[in-house]
Amino acid sequence: GELLDSYYMNQYTTQQYTDRVNEYYNTLCSKVDIWEIGNEINGEWLGNTTDVVAKMTSAYNIIKSHNAKTAITLYYNYNCWSNPQNEMFRWAIQNIPANMKSGLDYVWVSYYEDDCNNYQPNWQRMMDSLHTIFPNSKLGIGECGTSIVSQKTQYMQRYYKMNITTPNFKGGYFWRSNRRDCSTSI
């Protein structure tokens, strides 16, 4: 269950986010298996890093206190960030506490080639690097897609056919606009 899309994170104080986490958990705990405690958590649009880390950590502690599964989604932004402090690996190493690095159940990556100068990552190397930081977490692609209509089929084929052998890599490949893009009208 996504607690809050990254787009809205900067509209919540830490207390409001904490209240939201508690409310969502108490309402939906019987229906949600995995709780996404931070969506595109290193995104430059989320607000002050100190506040973002406080929100993420609070959510993690709340969900883990119920022995529930946690996930975090990182925004892959190789060479397309405004502030180098927000580069995905750098941000994760510097801002995610050690107990979360060893305790997160899932770590997902959000990536849109359109956002990053059409860069196509070496996914094997990238997932291997993530596994080093999060050795106990299951890894995957939490969001991908494109707004370029003529490229959607090509992108889908590329992402869904990836063969990544990193330990604990589970796949994912959650195409952001799947319902719309995969309908028979396309």
Which residues fall in each region the model found?
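Short, acidic/polar
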Residues: 13-27, 83-98, 154-163
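Extracytoplasmic low-complexity repetitive segments enriched in small/polar residues
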Residues: 19, 23, 57-58, 117, ...
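Surface-exposed charge patches in extracellular/virion surface proteins
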Residues: 15, 31, 64-69, 101, ...
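Acidic-and-aromatic substrate-binding clefts and catalytic sites of carbohydrate-active enzymes
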Residues: 5-15, 42-50, 75-89, 112-123, ...
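Acidic (Asp/Glu)-rich catalytic clusters
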Residues: 23-31, 65, 92-102, 127-134, ...
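Substrate-binding cleft of secreted/luminal carbohydrate-active enzymes
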Residues: 112, 137-186
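Substrate-binding cleft and catalytic face of glycoside hydrolase catalytic domains
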Residues: 1-80
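Aromatic- and acid-rich polysaccharide-binding/catalytic face
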Residues: 1, 32-39, 72-76, 86-123, ...
